[in-house]
Swiss-Prot record:
Variant or mutagenesis effect after changing residue 27 to A: Decreases the ability to bind Cu(II) by approximately 2-fold and abolishes the ability to bind Cu(I)
Subcellular localization, as worded in the UniProt entry: Cell membrane
Identification of the protein by name: Copper-binding protein CutI
Compositional bias of kind Polar residues: 147-157
Annotated membrane topology: Single-pass type I membrane protein
Signal peptide: 1-26
Entry binding sites for Cu(2+): 27, 50
Transmembrane segment boundaries: 179-199
One cellular component term from this protein's GO annotations in UniProt: plasma membrane
UniProt note: domains: Adopts a cupredoxin fold. Employs a monohistidine brace motif to bind copper.
Annotated site location: Stabilizes the metal-protein interaction: 137
Topological domains, Extracellular: 27-178
Cytoplasmic side: 200-204
Length: 204
């Protein structure tokens, strides 16, 4: 009975998960989601075409304190930069051929220097379609068209396998603790073997 219920519910659960995760995967995104302060990072912007029209242009506004440095050339796209009055910089990728067709995506790679302090970097992107319509990826996390976020962390911070943030000192302390425990275990094993050998010798 339980097996039947599980078999019935599994497709529904999987379908629900796909329903909720699919729209997010179609968003314009900038990766990595986390980067060290003060570093030169290689970022990748992924742009899917959500309409039955080609995407012909993408404009990405650099977050505050993030300094655009260079880009990777892509056949079929020309790149230009523009400085604004607020000292921010926008980078434009414009198609010289067919653009991003329906059902396709394109990745744009560039290098930028991160700010020297920890902060959130919000990537505002503007996606232009062939009919002149524009999708503004500038909203917050819960918006229909959210901007991508990169967490700029302290240079000494790292993220462990559970997603928790810790400093390099913590990592070193963890390593030292592990070595101490190993040494204690080996010492205890040596003592046990010594006692066992002594008892055996006395019995003999």
């Amino acid at each position: 009975m339980l097996k039947k219920i599980a078999l019935t519910l599994c497709p529904a659960i999987v379908g629900s998960l796909l329903f909720f995760t699919a729209p997010a995967s179609a968003h314009v995104s900038v990766k990595p989601a986390e980067s060290a302060a003060g570093s030169w990072e290689t970022y990748t912007m992924k742009v899917p075409s959500e309409k039955n029209l080609p995407t012909t242009k993408v404009v990405l506004k650099m977050p505050k304190d993030v300094e655009f440095q260079q880009y990777e050339p892509i056949p079929g796209w020309k790149v230009s930069t523009q400085k604004h009055d607020d000292k921010s910089v926008s980078v434009t990728w414009e198609a010289t051929d067919g653009g991003i067709q329906e059902g396709q995506f394109q990745q744009f790679t560039f290098v930028a220097k991160n700010p020297d302090k920890a902060e959130e970097a919000a990537w505002d992107a503007y996606q232009y379609y062939k009919d002149g319509s524009i999708v503004e990826w500038t909203g917050d996390e819960d918006a229909d068209t959210p901007h991508s976020i990169t967490n700029i962390t302290s240079a000494k911070q790292v993220t462990d396998e559970h997603g928790a943030t810790k400093t390099e000192d913590d990592s070193e302390n963890s390593g030292s603790s592990a070595l101490d425990i190993t040494a204690m275990v080996l010492s205890a094993a040596a003592i046990i073997l010594s006692v066992a050998a002594l008892v055996k010798k006395k019995r003999a």
